[in-house]
Amino acid sequence: MKVFVLNGPNLGRLGKREPA
């Protein structure tokens, strides 16, 4: 859930876990 919030700046790292 929180990964979605950081999906912007951390799209490379958290984007792989939660491509929301």
From Swiss-Prot:
One of its GO terms (molecular function) is 3-dehydroquinate dehydratase activity. It is an enzyme of class 4 (lyase). Gene3D superfamilies: Dehydroquinase, class II (3.40.50.9100). One of its GO terms (biological process) is chorismate biosynthetic process. Keywords: Amino-acid biosynthesis, Aromatic amino acid biosynthesis, Lyase, Quinate metabolism. The record marks 17 as: Transition state stabilizer. Pathway: Metabolic intermediate biosynthesis; chorismate biosynthesis; chorismate from D-erythrose 4-phosphate and phosphoenolpyruvate: step 3/7. Catalyzes a trans-dehydration via an enolate intermediate. Is involved in both the catabolism of quinate and the biosynthesis of aromatic amino acids. This is 3-dehydroquinate dehydratase. The gene is aroQ.
